[in-house]
Amino acid sequence: MQRVGSSFSTGQREPGENRVASRCPSVALAERNQVATLPVRLLRDEVQGNGCEQPSFQIKVDAQGFAPEDLVVRIDGQNLTVTGQRQHESNDPSRGRYRMEQSVHRQMQLPPTLDPAAMTCSLTPSGHLWLRGQNKCLPPPEAQTGQSQKPRRGGPKSSLQNESVKNP
């Protein structure tokens, strides 16, 4: 596993977003076999359509009770892993002593057409962790075949025009 030092963040903030540092820095995927940790952004409002292009991939994970720093989202090739742990202890003389532990673990395989470097991760106030991504851009058809898609000259349309000129 290799870590790369550039960030997934586009530098643009979404409406209602508070940036909270994740406990692991974000890293970009330069090659398929590298591992990346996505930053978890905390949103002030629930996720809604904002008129932007819809993501080609999205998943919602129940992470109620977790803070962004409690969650780790990793991409390893085409595998996505979401893990989180949280502990809380109290020793209140009037209420007694208690210890609470909570964990979440989700793992799935990403579609091969997905661009892992374009993935975003947001945590809503209601505790939903949204992971969104776009498909990789495909090269134009010319680059795929190596041939130009120029229209042919002298096709059926031009021969019809010539016939109409010959027959007045």
Swiss-Prot record:
- Entry keyword Nucleus: yes
Write down the InterPro entries for this protein, in alphabetical order. A-crystallin/Hsp20_dom (IPR002068), HSP20-like_chaperone (IPR008978), HSPB9 (IPR042940)
Q: CDD domains, per this entry? A: ACD_HspB9_like (cd06481)
- In this chain, the stretch annotated as Disordered covers 1-25, 83-104, 129-168
| Disulphide linkage map | none
Matching Pfam families, A to Z?
HSP20 (PF00011)
Location in or out of the cell: Cytoplasm; Nucleus
Which keywords has UniProt assigned to this entry?
A: Cytoplasm, Nucleus, Stress response
- Spans of biased composition, class Basic and acidic residues? 86-104
Q: Which GO terms describe its cellular component?
A: cytoplasm; nucleus
- What is the tissue localization of expression for this protein? Testis specific.
Stretches of Polar residues bias are at 1-12, 158-168
The protein's superkingdom reads: Eukaryota
Which part of the chain is the sHSP domain?
38-151
User: Which family, according to UniProt?
Assistant: Belongs to the small heat shock protein (HSP20) family.
Q: In its UniProt entry, what is this protein called?
A: Heat shock protein beta-9
What species was this sequence derived from? Mus musculus
Gene behind this protein? Hspb9
